[in-house]
Amino acid sequence: VFIRHTHLAQEVDEDTFFHSPETGGTVVSTALDEMKRVIKDRYSPDDWNIYGAQASDGDNTSSDNERTERLLTETILPACQYYAYLEVGREGEHFPPGFARRHSDLWQTYARVVASGAPLAMRKVNHRRDIFPVFRELFQKKPAEAA
């Protein structure tokens, strides 16, 4: 299932997700609301193992961060086996040595969720081309722990 969003979210096919540009304000909670709807309508956690993956530039309307955190912790993560968030830097954005890009408000919101012990993995990449390799790493089968 592919969900894209700006200030509104919608489920789209894979080709549209990857190749149809969208612009506009960013309200992340709309995508989480859409994921909640898809889970409720078609993928009950009683019948499916649900894995979520989110890639973002980190932009979110600041007034939406609290709602995003609440949806993630109260609805999305309890329905998922695993959830990964990947934040992509802006292409061509460079910082002098010793300077780093400030954590986005969305990154800080999700970091609070991780700090609470939630099953959420977070990574940053510098380029869109790095998205799939990092998602592959995050979702690779982990060796079983010794009992």
Where are these regions (language model features)?
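Von Willebrand factor
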Residues: 1-52, 59, 86-88
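A short acidic (Asp/Glu
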Residues: 11-16, 62-66, 95-97
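A short, acidic, amphipathic alpha-helical segment used as a generic capping/interface helix at domain edges
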Residues: 35-42, 64-74
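DG-centered beta-turn motif at the end of beta-strands
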Residues: 49-64, 88
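Von Willebrand factor type A / integrin I
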Residues: 71-147
